[in-house]
Structures are given as C-alpha cells and as structure tokens.
Amino acid sequence: MHIINARLRNQEGLHELHLENGLISNIGRQTEAPTLGPDDLDAGGNLVVPPFVEPHIHLDATLTAGEPRWNMSGTLFEGIECWSERKVTITGEDTRTRVRKTLQSLAAHGIQHVRTHVDVTDPQLTALKAMLEMREESRHLVDMQIVAFPQEGIESYRNGRELMEEAIRMGADVVGGIPHFEYTRDQGVSSVKFLMDLAERTGCLVDVHCDETDDPHSRFLEVLAEEARSRDMGSRVTAS
C-alpha cells in the first residue's frame, strides 16, 4: 500500500509513504506524478502526521450523559452520583456497544493510542470484562491500555482491595486510585500505599485521579509523589 501526495511536517514538497504489514517501510519525496493503485490512498496534498493519543478517557461511561438523570449542579461529585446510578444497569452488551461506537469515532479522528479508566467498584466487574473483550476486538483500530479505576474508593468500598487485585489478575494494564474520594485522609493515604504496592508487585503502571477538588487540604499528590520517589517508580506513575 502507498500513501501518495502527502505533506510532512518541516518538509517541502509532496511525499510518498510505502506501507508493509501495516507499518511504514519507506518515505520518499515525489519527483513525478505517481500512479494510484487499487489499494493506495491519495492524501491530496494534506498533512500526514503520526496518530494522536487519548491519554485519559472513561470508555465504560461513554455515551451515558443524561442517564438516568442530568448532572444539574455540573459538579464532579454529582456526576459520580449519576454514574453510580447508571452503573447498576450496565450489561456487557450495553458497554460493548457504547465502547465500539466511541472507538470508531476516536479512530476516525486520528487517535490510535487510548488509555481508558474502567470502574472496578462493581462486585461483578461487568465493565472490566466487556472492556477486556473490546481491547481484543479493536486491536486493528487502537492500542488500548486499561486502568483498574476504583471510582468509589479502595478503602471506602466493600472488598475494594480484592476487586483491584482481581482486575489486575484479569488483565488490566494500569493500577488506578482516587484517594481524595476515600472517607478519611487516613484511608486516602492507605489507598495510595496499597495501589503502589500492587503496582510494584505486579510490574504495572500507575495512573491516579488525584486531588480533583477545591479543598486546599486535599494533598494526596505529595503522598503519591513520595511513594513514587521512594520506590524509584517515577517513570511509571501518572497523576491525572
């Protein structure tokens, strides 16, 4: 396959890209008008760039706005309440249908790498099971990383630790957290230490929702940073 009449960043003129087995094998400047083959793509003089990255999305909750009700306050915490009400109604098929539609839209907009947080504060882990299936189904479209995300807390949710560990055993790539949503500061600190232990033990990456609040006393970012520093895990840890 060839992509012809392509413009590249910081390059003059038009270029032709040669692809083999889904990868770019060669890029050359066009010196004459190329012939368009049946499997080729004419970029029409448009810019060709590497694929984009979606570093933070919640695919399990996509396309659910207004279900079962609208977030009338516009606050994060009412949004979480709305999702908790919607979450009890999800099924595997419901999740797969919404995720499939969203992934197609992402790919159509040039996104090839996706990191999605998936709520694992669900005794059945329904959304996670569906997302693991979608990761395989969509490999031809996107590279997907799945974050085991404890939306309702690790220490504050019944069997929260066990659900996190099970999510990683099932195939989640990244350990998540939400320390500011735990009931107490002590529980928030404990949740950070637990998730860092889990990531260190399993070799997973870390991506923690941290201090999403106007409360100036919410200071879990420094707890996470110190855990990352003391364990020499800085390059594996994201606060988002």
Language model features: what each stretch is:
Residues 1-35:
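N-terminal metal-binding scaffold of metallo-dependent hydrolase/deaminase domains
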Residues 62-95, 171-174, 220-239:
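Active-site gating loops and adjacent loop-to-helix segments of metal-dependent hydrolytic enzymes
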Residues 94-103, 156-166:
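Short, acidic/polar
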Residues 126-137, 157-239:
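Histidine/acidic residue-rich metal-binding segments in metalloenzymes
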Residues 78-89, 99-126, 131-132, 139-152, ...:
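Divalent metal-dependent hydrolysis catalytic cores, especially in the metallo-beta-lactamase
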Residues 6, 22, 45, 56, ...:
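Divalent metal-coordination and catalytic microenvironments
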